[in-house]
Design a protein with these regions (language model features):
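Juxtamembrane helix-loop-helix connectors linking adjacent transmembrane helices
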Residues: 38-62, 83-159, 166-171, 302-306, ...
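Small-polar-interrupted transmembrane alpha-helices in polytopic inner-membrane proteins
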Residues: 113, 150-151, 174-191, 205-209
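Membrane-interface helix/loop boundary segments of multi-pass membrane proteins
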Residues: 10, 156-181, 214-221
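N-terminal, membrane-interfacial amphipathic/helix-forming hydrophobic leader that caps
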Residues: 1-94, 98, 237-319
Length: 319
């Protein structure tokens, strides 16, 4: 293969694999720089350890913001420098239908979790009751304040995994490779969570990555996957009282309390539904629903931003 073809595609742009490599390295550097700056700030201003702060709810929010900021800065830079794209191409533009996509995604995410919970009830593994141990005020605060927390967390992960990495492979006509290369790291990133059931957890989280990638591809924006992602977590933790990817500290006074009688292969045990078969079934159905439904479609503007770069280049030359 000629050096020209090894590095550049027929549109004269750096190939998608090299673009992804640049994004990954730049993201790691920028995220580390932001992390170092925050560590200094915590020690000087808060007079405490960075580790202690990051384990708190406030620290969780800060980590989500760092993830989002680093992925957004690097994604915008790669898009602008490597592909001549505006910041709107990353998928957060208030394009026509963005609010509808966010709302539909929120409904889809919440309903999908409820379906998984119903499977757990039908299998006699999950038993729900109202949380009588918590006051209405505490429950209300949990429902209210965890919503923006889960939105921030989902925004960071969507920006990183369904942002520039997936989008640049889509423009290179390597969509399925992009789905693979974003869904598996997305799953691997959750393996450090508490109470992981490694095989099932990885498989289910990878399936969730495919689901969220499908949501992006159907609309070519991040509003639909954001809606799905945050509502899935919020419904699971704040409403149903289930562990969210093994984490329970984020929703201290959920609306419902759950008794998990297992078996763990069905319900996920201490990791929550995402470690069990009820989640696998719900995700498979949700993927088909999002991919096959006819009422999800991208705006012309967002479709153009992820158009085939080679075909687009030929069109410009021909014009």
């Amino acid at each position: 293969m000629e050096t020209h073809n090894l590095f550049l595609n027929k549109a004269g742009r750096l190939r998608s694999g090299w673009r992804l490599g640049i994004f990954v390295v730049a993201f790691a550097v920028v995220a580390k720089l932001i992390e170092m700056a925050l560590t200094v700030i915590v020690r000087l201003v808060l007079k405490g350890s960075a580790e202690g702060f990051l384990s708190s709810s406030a620290g969780f929010i800060v980590q989500a913001l760092v993830l989002f900021a680093a992925a957004a800065i690097v994604g915008w830079g790669c898009g602008a420098l490597l592909e001549d794209l505006p910041a709107r191409a990353l998928g957060w533009a208030n394009h026509r239908g963005w609010l509808r996509d966010l709302g539909l995604g929120s409904i889809i995410g919440a309903v999908s979790v409820l379906f998984a919970a119903l499977l757990g009830i039908a299998g006699r593994g999950l038993h729900f009751s109202l949380n009588a141990a918590a006051t209405p005020s505490a429950i209300g605060k949990t429902l209210l304040f965890t919503a923006p927390l889960f939105v921030l967390a989902a925004s960071g992960e969507e920006m990183l995994f369904r942002g520039y990495p997936l989008q640049t492979f889509t423009r290179a006509r390597l969509t399925w490779l992009g789905i693979f290369l974003t869904s598996f790291p997305f799953a691997a990133a959750h393996l450090a969570n508490p109470n992981v059931v490694r095989g099932v957890t990885f498989a289910n989280t990878a399936l969730a990555g495919v689901w969220l990638a499908a949501a992006y591809l159907r609309t070519r924006s991040l509003w639909l996957p954001l809606g799905i992602h945050w509502a899935w977590n919020w419904m699971m933790g704040a409403v149903l009282g289930l562990p969210v990817s093994g984490i329970t500290r984020l929703a201290p006074a959920s609306l419902l309390r759950v008794q998990d009688t297992g078996p763990a292969w069905l319900t996920g045990g201490a990791y929550g539904p995402e470690g069990g078969a009820i989640c696998t079934i719900a995700l498979l159905i949700a993927i088909v629903l999002v991919w096959r439904t006819s009422w999800l479609k991208p705006s012309e503007e967002m479709l153009k931003f992820t158009a085939d770069e080679i075909r687009e280049q030929k069109s410009e030359v021909g014009g």
